[in-house]
């Protein structure tokens, strides 16, 4: 059996049928996420070296000074054991510092560094432009409606922390 290398010919894709999943919301949510992340990678990751996940974590740390690593893991819906790797990356980039809690030596508190604050401000501007470009085919009202509907869906998930706010 020959392994497929590269992209298939456009003629192969012209006849592609997705079957019943073409009517499933989850399928379209995933396709939308892939498209958004692909554009983020082209515009933000290539220039700033930050993935959507790292950007999200920087936002949460910046808006919650002293947040513990465990709380960050819950807020980002990431396994606590894998959060250490990501925090290490952010610390190695000089964007955050990890301090031992004065009340519990087993707990680490996360804070932005001055260079991290500057980098986040620059990245936020780029993300705002990227987000506007990505949603350019939607009116402001449609964009607001879509965000509202998506929030309603993920807030019904029993594993989404109730105290996570925008």
Swiss-Prot record:
One Pfam family, short name: MarR_2
Keyword annotations: DNA-binding, Transcription, Transcription regulation
Swiss-Prot/TrEMBL GO biological process terms: response to stress
Position of the signal peptide: none
Domain of life of the source: Bacteria
Keyword Iron: no
Domain HTH marR-type: from-to ranges: 1-155
Molecular functions (GO terms): DNA binding; DNA-binding transcription factor activity
Gene3D superfamilies, A to Z: Winged helix-like DNA-binding domain superfamily/Winged helix DNA-binding domain
Functional description taken from the UniProt entry: May be involved in the regulation of genes for 4-hydroxybenzoyl-CoA reductase.
Annotated protein name in UniProt: Putative transcriptional regulatory protein for hcr operon
